[in-house]
Every structure is written in structure tokens, then in C-alpha cells.
A protein has these predicted regions:
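Domain-level detector of nuclease and nuclease-like folds
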Residues: 61-68, 72-220
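Aromatic-lined ligand-binding clefts that engage carbohydrates, nucleic acids, or primary amines
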Residues: 23-66, 177-180, 190-191
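General helical structural elements
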Residues: 6-7, 197
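Positively charged n-region of N-terminal signal peptides that target proteins for export
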Residues: 1-4
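Intrinsically disordered, low-complexity segments enriched in polar/charged small residues
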Residues: 7-8, 80
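Cleavable N-terminal signal peptides
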Residues: 8-10, 20
């Protein structure tokens, strides 16, 4: 069974291995993106990025914890790069910002309180175990957030996708850490299937899910 599972993953990677790099233009705004996120990618639920909490609807987990959508590459970083003003100003005046914040490759389900805790803090490693919540391997210190190991590869590939797709900056120290996370936590079958679903919805793939070793070629 395990061998068949691995072969299936390989088949998915080979079948959809052609690179597609062009700004997504099929989802014009975040409201549409949210509808597609909950209604088309996760109509039957999944697990939250940071805590692995199972959910079957768009409002809460199975044990009643409120949900939200996490932008792995924070929207505040996008605004800083575009210099388009605050969130409302950027939504009103920058089409590029609207497309960036609506890119499904950068969006994951998260517990609302954990999403709020992370804010726009960069990811990193906190020296000692410092769980913010007793039900979740998520750590927070001033100016740094440490996700659970099983989420780190997804996070790395999302950030590098946003960097290449939109020219968004990534700090060199963070890039080095994310490259290691990509090595340690390769794409799962679910991440590969999600890549396929998103391509159907917005016309772009994350090439680093298809070819994670290409991340090593990125220069910072």
C-alpha cells in the first residue's frame, strides 16, 4: 500500500510537471478568491496549516474553533513592496495588489487566533520550546513565528512562488532557512493535488511543488 501511494504521488508530479509562470489573472479580487478557496478547493474540509486541526466547513474546526485564511506571504509585505498605501487604498487603486492577495497558492486555512498571533511576523526557529497554545506545535516570540515541521515545506514553496511570480522580496536569511525547510519537508500528495486544483481555478501552478529542487537555483 505504501509503495502504491508513493507511485501515485510520482505520477501526479510527472503528469503536471510543465512549468507555468505568469501572474494569475483569473481571480480578480479577494472576495472571489475566498469563495473559490472554501467552495472549490476545500468543499469537504481539510486540516489547518499551523495546528493540523480538522475542519469540514468554512467557519470552524470539528471541535468548534473559528477559522480564517492565512496569507503565507503577508499582505502587509505586498503593500510595502508596492508602496500603494494601506489595505483599502491598495485594494481600490492597485490591480496588481488585488491579484497578489487573491492568489490561491499563497492561501491556507488556519485557526483564527493562530493567524492573528502570527500577524506579519517572519518565520524562523525559536531556540527553546515555547508553544503559544497547548493544542498546537506553533511557537511565537517577538518578531518571529515558528510553524510545526510538517507545514514548513508548504510555507517555503508558497513564499518562493510569490517571490518568483510577482517579484516580491525575500530576506536572504529567511530564504536560507526556507530552502532548508523545502529540503526537510518535500511536497506531499495532498500538496500536489492542491497544485492541480489551483491551476484549474486560476491558470497557474506552483513550479516548486512540481520541481522542489529548483529552489536551490534561486539567488538572494
Amino acid at each position: 500500500m505504501k509503495r502504491a501511494f508513493i507511485i501515485t504521488c510520482i505520477a501526479i508530479a510527472v503528469l503536471f510537471s510543465h512549468p507555468i509562470l505568469a501572474d494569475q489573472t483569473q481571480i480578480p479580487n479577494y472576495q472571489t478568491a475566498k469563495q473559490k478557496f472554501w467552495g472549490d478547493i476545500y468543499p469537504y474540509g481539510s486540516w489547518t496549516l499551523y495546528c493540523g486541526k480538522k475542519f469540514t466547513n468554512r467557519s470552524e474546526t470539528e471541535d468548534g474553533m473559528p477559522l480564517s485564511i492565512e496569507h503565507v506571504y503577508p499582505r502587509s509585505w505586498m503593500r510595502d513592496h508596492l508602496e500603494c498605501g494601506n489595505h483599502d487604498q491598495c485594494q481600490d487603486n492597485s490591480e496588481r495588489y488585488r491579484l497578489m492577495e487573491s492568489d490561491l497558492h499563497n492561501m491556507y486555512g488556519a485557526l483564527r487566533n493562530v493567524n492573528s498571533s502570527r500577524g506579519d511576523a517572519p518565520y524562523g526557529i525559536i531556540p527553546e520550546e515555547n508553544w503559544r497554545y497547548d493544542y498546537c506545535d506553533y511557537e511565537r516570540a517577538p518578531n518571529i513565528a515558528e510553524p510545526r515541521p510538517i507545514a514548513r515545506g508548504n510555507i517555503a514553496r508558497s513564499i518562493f512562488y510569490m517571490h518568483v511570480e510577482y517579484g516580491l522580496p525575500v530576506d536572504s536569511d529567511l530564504a536560507s532557512l526556507l530552502k532548508q525547510w523545502n529540503r526537510d519537508d518535500p511536497p506531499s500528495c495532498h500538496e500536489m493535488r492542491r497544485n492541480n486544483w489551483i491551476e484549474e481555478l486560476q491558470g497557474t501552478r506552483n513550479p516548486f511543488i512540481d520541481h522542489p529542487k529548483k529552489i536551490e537555483d534561486l539567488q538572494f
